[in-house]
Amino acid sequence: IPVNDMENGWVYWSNWFGLDAVTSNIQVQRGLGASKIAIPSVGGTMNILTKGTRNKAGGTVKQSVGSFGKLRTSLGYNSGKLKNGWGYTLAGSYKRGNGFVDETWSEGFFYYAKIQKELGNHILSFSAMGAPQKHGQRSYKSDIATYDTTFARSLGDTSDFSERIVNKGISFNKHWGYLDRWILDSNGDTIHNREVLNTKQNYYHKPQFSLRDFWTINENFYVSNILYASIGNGGGTGLSGNTNNYDATGQYNLQEAYNANSNNIDALYSLDENKAGTYLRSSINNHFWYGGLSTLNYQFSDEISLSGGLDLRYYKGEHYREVYDLLGADYALDAANGLQDSEIKKLGEKVGYHNDGIVKWSGAFSQMEYSNGIVSAFLNISGSNSAYKRIDYFRKKDLVLADTTYIEALGTSVATELEFDNDGNLIGANKTMIEDTVWHNGTAYTMNSDEAKLA
């Protein structure tokens, strides 16, 4: 089952960190070579095989302890082959740690379950696994002097460090700070709620489900069919608004942001709710991915084998930002959505961008392989076809007519309404959204017209 991200090709090992508890063996190929996939990887491939009815019954219990609070507990059990050809495999794991870098804590769980049934020449199996996790982060690709100017100087960096923060050590992380989420109760008393908050956090959960049929037609002919689905949900947080508010020690001044947000009425938008000058947003990357794999292998002799297969995939990735933490405010402002009816955004509402990436992928391969123990050679013929579509829900819609197209012409625009008294003095104002209107051949079109299409 392929696990490389369908949009960028990356592999996120944290999505199945506890799989070692039920791993039977790992097949590793370095560089281009004979491999039963539609598009052989130039860099190489890795295939992880889990335990099943063909393996011995047994279990493992493992406790790992490491530096910086690293702790991991793992359990795994494989039943082997039971009566009537049944078998099952179970695994679970929990990990946590503080991290070498300040406030880069981590916590994660892993679960795995597989049930198998031998039915004649078939082995049927269903499996499910996932690893919900979250961890603190810091920005990367920064020079050493960002953390420790003395250490950078010892390595030969002759840059001007006069504007740098005082030496904090290479474990320094500027993205966290102390925060007291105080509130006033009905009696006017201050209720304190103190915490340490890392503004850069990552959280994700990508469960995967598969249904497999391994069919041994005879001792020379083998067919495998797999259906699978994967559902990913999660994202990473960061600051929005005033992103350059650091104190003398280099930490982000969260308390100052919270205090300002807690008393920030903007009459243009609300008379009784506080507007956020700084808040946390989360960049979300959800996806739904399903596919099917069918491969066959025929052994002509001890030296010659033929294999081939089909690989079909459908992937939909949903990408957007949302308001994650208002830091004492009631709402934030965002004007990125060209179709919105209000710039006011509450907790959990989308900001910044919102688009879908849809990938349809198909591939096929055939391979002849020769090996006599001294010389090995293979001939591989493969091909694939992919289609990508991007849908942007924040861009204004196109007006598509029979004789012309107006690009990104229909959505909403901001209007400011001013209020004056009888003497002409300005006494108030408020922001509103109005629908864009395009007139064509005497007909008015808006974003709700049938002819309005997403970009």
Model-found features: residue ranges?
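Acidic/polar loop-and-plug regions of large Gram-negative outer-membrane beta-barrel proteins
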Residues: 124-210, 237-281, 338-345, 421-424
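Signature of Gram-negative outer-membrane beta-barrel scaffolds
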Residues: 307-455
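Transmembrane beta-strands of outer-membrane beta-barrel pores
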Residues: 63-69, 79-81, 94-98, 119-121, ...
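Outer-membrane beta-barrel transmembrane strands
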Residues: 193-238, 276-307, 318-319, 348-382, ...
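Outer-membrane beta-barrel proteins
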Residues: 64-72, 95-118, 138, 175-214, ...
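Short acidic/polar hinge/loop motifs at secondary-structure boundaries
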Residues: 2-30, 49, 154
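Flexible, surface-exposed loop regions and adjacent strand-edge segments
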Residues: 105-110, 141-151, 156-158, 240-254, ...
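Short strand-turn segments of transmembrane beta-barrel domains in outer membranes
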Residues: 35, 45-81, 91-102
